[in-house]
Amino acid sequence: MTATATTTEGQETASTSGFWGLTLGSIGVVFGDIGTSPLYAFREAAIGAAHGQPVSRMIVLGVLSLILWSLFIVVTAKYVLLLLRADNNGEGGTLSLMALGQRALGRRSMFLMALGVVGASMFIGDSMITPAISVLSAVEGLKLAAPALEHYVVPLTVFILVVLFAVQSKGTARVATAFGPVMVTWFLSLAVMGIVHISDDPSVLAAINPYYAVHFLLSHGTVGLVTLGAVFLAVTGGEALYADLGHFGRKPIQSAWLFFVLPALLINYFGQGALVLSDPAAIENSFYRMVPELLLLPLVVLATAATVIASQAVITGAYSLVSQAVQLGLLPRFEVRYTSESHAGQIYLPRVNRLLLIGVMLLVLMFRTSSNLASAYGIAVSTTMVADGIMGFVVIWKLWNLRAAVAAAIIAPFVIVDLTFFSANLLKLFEGAWVPLLFGAAMVVTIWTWRRGSAILTLKTRKIEVPLDDLVASLEKRPPHIVKGTAVFLTSDPTSVPTALLHNLKHNKVLHEHNVILTIETAQTPRVDVSERVRMEKISEKFSKVRLRFGFMESPNVPRALAVARKLGWQFDIMSTSFFVSRRSLKPSSQSGMPMWQDHLFIGLSRSANDATDYFQIPTGRVVEVGTQVTI
């Protein structure tokens, strides 16, 4: 009895410590973006609502009420309580939700594909704005802490961001352990600052009543809608709760949000409101005005650390999203480097890193202040949230087995709120919202071109390909010279003869004693169980088909996967195996079915793709590349 009790207690202790470890980790990673919103969200919303006039009591209460109920409806109800339950084998995020929706429908839906692509593309646009506005708003505290350094705000921001992107290739494993404690300190500071200032005017707590939010919107017309676009700054980052589901799990994220992060944010926002009610001039920078001059510099340092952590989380999210898009066939194979031997999810994509850095630098140098940049912020996130809501309807309807009317009744209120925020942000189109839309549109065109070009290329290739069964039958009747060893031919179509095999027969006039037609597939799930990794089919004495399946969040490692095939009876020895890979040289054609500019874009994307050898982690010394020229 004692031994059993001790064992059970030990397991519970380990389970409890694991839960709190994940909760602390989620505070350090998941909530960085939304957690740094108090730096600018209330200020921008109140100034926008005042419309050049002094900030009145009704404006402060209206803005606070809008922020509070937006956090309750969009983040708490929609993401924390609803969508966190719509996981794809434990994973979340826009592309994961898209794959889950398609699996629920039992077919590929172009509408869901379009929603997923648009949502993911806008996330990339957001990945450029978040580091720019977050770090810029933190460093702007220098204007109050050391007015003489005001002219160095932009250069210092640029320096911090360049260093941040420069160290990405080294990985973040060593410093990531500090993220949780730093962000806990940040949220505790937010709460303490808020508690201190709520006493300036406790009547600010009246804003809990949604009457003030509704009254503000009804009495301010277009200005109210514009203000709503600024209020949305308080909920940006809410989508990250769902995107990081796979890293920390549902319960740790829910617990961290409901019992720590949300209370700290609300207390701080209400503290800023009370401060402005007692001193309207404080609206100029209501966040930094909450602390005495002596604490300004330490707060600037803490805020900068928090915004760097928030930026790091967004950058890592962009790497993960692009990696998923590559696995799902939405983008060409980008070079992926692994920055940790123990954590497979810690990756670095050099090309994506460079593009993000260029985008972030352009934003900082174009807008120069967080107030200017706030106009550009929001449109990308609101688009992603609308896409998540609509895809969520499909999951609730089909996967949770609810009637369409019930599923619509559950999700419709959230989609209506998201569309309202989207409309409000659209009003800022010419003030800067066009920037993330431009980034997102460029990403959509890139994905569309890659998908369309790949489909056209596959169609053209299949027209000239020879059926595999016909070739095998022909070779059995008239076999060529047989050489020892195993040849593995990579192909996307296991029913046709790989180009590399035809070239080997035509030019070398030999056939290996064992020939494997290898197909690599991506499942609609984040990961594939090892038992489902390999499927083998023997065609003849000399030919076999092998299919390897990977999840869209897995790194395809062919040699490791083929080692699993040994257990299925395949005598696989990598030292006597040659991998034959086809490399296509593409030429544009006026008959391709795409405009010429799209032909050239597709060819450029194809040339920039990482070669199959590196992407599938095949030993370079065992690879034979066969070049072919194809006109699109």
Curated annotation (Swiss-Prot):
It comes from the Bacteria. Keywords: Cell inner membrane, Cell membrane, Ion transport, Membrane, Potassium, Potassium transport, Symport, Transmembrane, Transmembrane helix, Transport. The chain crosses the membrane at residues 19-39, 58-78, 110-130, 147-167, 178-198, 216-236, 257-277, 290-310, 347-367, 377-397, 404-424, 429-449. One of its GO terms (cellular component) is plasma membrane. The keyword Chloroplast does not apply. It catalyses: K(+)(in) + H(+)(in) = K(+)(out) + H(+)(out). The keyword Amino-acid biosynthesis does not apply. It is a multi-pass membrane protein. GO terms for molecular function: potassium ion transmembrane transporter activity; symporter activity. It is found in: Cell inner membrane. Pfam families: K_trans, K_trans_C. InterPro entries: K+_transporter, K_trans_C, K_trans_N, Kup. Belongs to the HAK/KUP transporter (TC 2.A.72) family. Transport of potassium into the cell. Likely operates as a K(+):H(+) symporter. This is Probable potassium transport system protein Kup 3. The gene is kup3.
